[in-house]
Amino acid sequence: MLFRGQNILGYRPYADDVVDAFVEKSIANGIDIIRIFDCLNDIRNLQEAVDATNRIKQREGRGHAQVALSYTLGDAYTMEYWTSMAKKIEEMGADSICIKDMAGLLVPYKASELIKEMKAATKLPIQLHTHYTSGVASMTYLKAVEAGVDVIDCAMSPFAMGTSQPATEVMVETFKGTEYDTGYDQNLLAEIADYFRPYRDECLKTGLLNPKVMGVDIKTLLYQVPGGMLSNMVSQLKEQNAEDRYYDVLKEIPEVRKDLGEPPLVTPSSQIVGTQAVFNVLMGERYKMATDQTKDMLRGKYGKTVKPMNQAVIDKVIPGEEIRTERSGAYVENEMDKLEAEMKEWKQQDEDVLSYALFPQVATDFFKYRKAQQDKVDLSKADTKNGAYPV
């Protein structure tokens, strides 16, 4: 499971008790490996989730804390930076490391160098996750495997390539007959691909899959935009009937990223940077309008960035406000009791509180639907607060 550290699955920092409860329920419901990352690579924001996983592992023998480093480019992201982070991850008690290359920026020979250096810096297993957006992912995997990486993430061919991962079948065939042979049966893999191919075609037909994000865009290497961010940006522009501003926004993204301390572009920082770039382009003036998330990033609410933020932007967007310097969770008081009190009329299991914590409106709509199905009533005519239902 991909887990955003102190942000869990949401877009804001949550209290430690919410992090602890979510990890516990995730493992209780069958999750084994929890891939924990922070959008700023701020190690402090990962510790609580790692500790929570390890407590359960010590108590029940279940759970694997995998810390993911969000790979990105920039003069601050040196080889020394990555090896230092690997050592810190081992020291904090993680079980393994994932290099999360969400934008497909890790090119083959750099991958070889990175894997060799990180394997020398830590004894932890290293897993590599990349995307095909820039077109180099399969070659990157080949060089990474030769350099000693332990695991590579792939996708079945109907949903591979583009903003997804390299195709499983291609990598299996690549290593066939070598010391890296997976032993997987291509005939069985073909059956799996055949099962999913009609669904892929249906997604294309309905528009759920946009052909724009299924090919290779070499400009990814220029603008450093990850696949999920690219898909989100296309949707935002489409909603505003501004798809013709696509490349204007792509050019603005690196500028916004620089203003915000050059963070890796991964959820939620990718959405923050991407949405602000869209605003800057469509408003015709940079930071004329700033999202609440942009303001929180400038306030230090998400943690520490690898480089200082643009003071001129800070002065324009949040003039005179205090900048926070501690880990993101330090500013959020325990909230599980408060959240449970808010949604107590809908609670049927502990997991409901967590659903509400992360997605309050979506969860509430679901709880109402569930109640209607269970009681066979029309909730649009019911007074749920006072427990009055039409008959």
Predicted regions and their residues:
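Glycine-rich phosphate-binding active-site loops on the catalytic face of alpha/beta enzymes
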Residues: 36-39, 101, 147-164
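Core active-site phosphate/anionic-ligand binding loop and the adjoining beta-turn-alpha structural block
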Residues: 139, 164, 172-175, 182-239
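Alpha-helix-loop-beta-strand connector modules within alpha/beta enzyme cores
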Residues: 1-2, 49-70, 111-128, 172-184
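Catalytic cores of alpha/beta
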Residues: 77-89, 134-150
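Terminal or standalone catalytic/regulatory effector modules within metabolic enzymes
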Residues: 210-220, 224-391
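Conserved, mostly hydrophobic/aromatic
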Residues: 36, 97, 148, 171, ...
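Active-site beta->alpha loop and helix N-cap motifs at the rims of alpha/beta catalytic domains
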Residues: 1-52, 56, 64-90, 107-108
